[in-house]
Amino acid sequence: MTPQDFYRTLEEDGFSLSSKQKEQFDTYFKLLVEWNTKINLTAITEENEVYLKHFYDSIAPILQGFLANEPIKLLDIGAGAGFPSLPMKILFPNLEVTIIDSLNKRISFLTLLAQELGLENVHFFHGRAEDFGQDKAFRGQFDVVTARAVARMQVLSELTIPFLKIGGKLIALKAQAADQELEEAKNALCLLFGKVIKNHSYQLPNGDSRFITIVEKKKETPNKYPRKAGLPNKKPL
C-alpha cells in the first residue's frame, strides 16, 4: 500500500486527509525507520508495508466505526512504536491519548515523535500496566483503552479493564480470530465485570484478515485487580 493508496482508501471511506496529516504520516514513517536502527521498534520498515500493516491497521477501529473524533480519554497499553493510538490521533486530533510502555527507550522515541508531529494532548508514561492500574490518577479514568497484539484476552483484560470508567470500552486489535481466546477469558471477564459487546472481523486492503474485540466495563473493578507486575501473565485469571 503506497502512501497514495493509503490516502485514496481513506478518502473512499470518507476521511480526506489534509496536507498536514499527510506530512505527519510521512514524518512518522521516516522517524520510525531512523530510530529502528537504534532501538528495536518494528520488524516492518518497508514504506508500503508500514502504511498497510502499521498505519492502516492502527486506524481500522475508526474506519470500522468504533471511534469518533471526540475529546475522549484514550489509553494505549504496550503501544511500542505508538500503534494503534498515534495514527488514530493523527486522523482524529480531538482524542486525548495516553500511552504506557515498559521500555524507557520507546518512551524517548514517542516523546520526540509527538514533538516532531506537533501532536497536542498526548502523554507518555514509563512503567508496567499492573502498577499504573492501581494508581488513582489512572484507575477508572479512561473512556477507551486500546491494545494491539499485546496479550491474549485472558491476560489483557486484567491489564486494561481497571483503567476504564464504567461504560468504557476496551478495543483489542488482533491478527487471529479471538473465539478460542474469549472462551479462555470467560472467568477473567466475569471477575473484572467486562462484557464482550462486539467481535468483529474485517480485511486489510491486501486481503489479510484482522479482528477487533470490544469489551465494555459494567461495574467497578475489584480493588485486588490488577495484581502485581508479572502475575497476570504467569497466573492468568
Curated annotation (Swiss-Prot):
Specifically methylates the N7 position of a guanine in 16S rRNA. One of its GO terms (molecular function) is rRNA (guanine-N7-)-methyltransferase activity. This is Ribosomal RNA small subunit methyltransferase G. Belongs to the methyltransferase superfamily. RNA methyltransferase RsmG family. It is an enzyme of class 2 (transferase). The keyword S-adenosyl-L-methionine applies. S-adenosyl-L-methionine binds at residues 78, 83, 129-130, 148. SUPFAM superfamilies: S-adenosyl-L-methionine-dependent methyltransferases (SSF53335). The lineage of its organism: Bacteria, Bacillati, Bacillota, Bacilli, Lactobacillales. CDD domains: AdoMet_MTases (cd02440). One of its GO terms (cellular component) is cytosol. Keywords: Cytoplasm, Methyltransferase, rRNA processing, S-adenosyl-L-methionine, Transferase. Its EC number is 2.1.1.-. It is found in: Cytoplasm.
